[in-house]
Regions:
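Outer-membrane beta-barrel "beta-signal"
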Residues: 35-37, 253-270
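Substrate-binding/catalytic groove segments of enzymes
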Residues: 171-173, 204-213, 222-228, 270
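Residues on the lipid-exposed face of transmembrane beta-strands in outer-membrane beta-barrel proteins
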Residues: 40-42, 89-97, 106, 140-146, ...
């Protein structure tokens, strides 16, 4: 299942790359005079539901966390859940010429959480899962302003579309799995991989140099990955000694929709 997600992400990433290349081509063909601008803003993302599963469910040394069986809900062993609402802050440096803009964009998601349930036990029994995450992404993005003659006018609102592609480094902390009598801990991990986004929004000029952007954005940050490492099972009543585990990696996909509110400030032209 995860392989299919990754294949789709790669295809979408290639589409985003083509869109960025198109934006660069438009910029190169636009008027010679352009403007350098700085962007700062914040936003909220709502990643879609996902599931942590083994990279190799048949692994024995190290041991697969979930294994290849079927859980009490009839699905493969996994931890299914979501990341909730994710805050993001961003900073960009861009060049605008004519209808095209080209931008180097960095976004930081300082703190968000996975909350879900495993399916080892029958539905309704305690088997909750939690972990905290953060990510930093860097992308090259292209935008096209759509205020061309012949298109519908929206008053002071200037619509735009864009896409970007780059890299992301995502970190997940220790995962805690709570069962009726035991608690299992899984080591965290970091992963650097492909990231891409597509966006559409409107801009409002607040002055000669300042523009407010409000945009929808779809962002694909690829996979979140726990690393191979030591975990353990603890009996909360102390009836047994903690059991150490040598665990193989697991992963889940991190992608979803969000909104962005930002200000662009023109620093100068050339």
């Amino acid at each position: 299942m995860l392989g299919g997600h990754n294949g789709a992400g790669a295809r979408h990433g290639r589409v985003a790359a083509l869109a960025v290349a198109a934006g660069m081509w438009l910029a190169s063909g636009a008027a010679a005079a352009g403007e350098i601008y700085l962007r700062g803003g914040f936003g909220l993302d709502r990643p879609g539901d996902t599931a942590f599963m083994d990279e190799d469910c048949s692994s024995t040394a190290p041991a697969a966390l979930y294994g290849c069986g079927t859980g009490g809900d009839g699905a493969p062993y996994r931890s299914a859940g979501g990341f909730g609402t994710v805050p993001a802050v961003g900073l960009g440096l861009g060049y605008a010429a004519g209808a095209a803009r080209f931008e180097a964009l960095v976004e930081y998601r300082p703190a968000f959480a996975f909350r879900g349930r495993t399916n080892f036990l029958a539905p309704g029994r305690q088997q909750s899962v939690s972990a905290n995450l953060s990510s930093v992404s860097g992308m090259l993005a292209g935008f096209v302003d759509l205020g061309a003659p012949g298109l519908p006018e929206l008053g002071r609102l200037a619509p735009f579309v864009g896409a970007g592609i780059g890299v992301v480094r995502t970190r997940i902390g220790k995962t805690t799995m709570t069962f009726p009598t035991t608690t299992t801990t899984v080591p965290g991990g970091t992963r650097t991989g492909l990231a891409w986004m597509a966006t559409a929004g409107v801009a409002v000029a607040l002055g000669e140099r300042v523009t407010l952007d409000l945009a929808w954005r779809y962002t694909d940050l690829g996979a979140v990955r726990t690393k191979r490492g030591p975990g353990r099972v603890v009996w909360r009543d102390g009836s047994q000694e903690p059991r150490p585990l040598d665990l193989a990696p697991t992963r889940a996909r991190l992608a979803g929709h969000g909104v962005r509110l930002s200000l662009r400030y023109v620093m100068g032209g050339f």
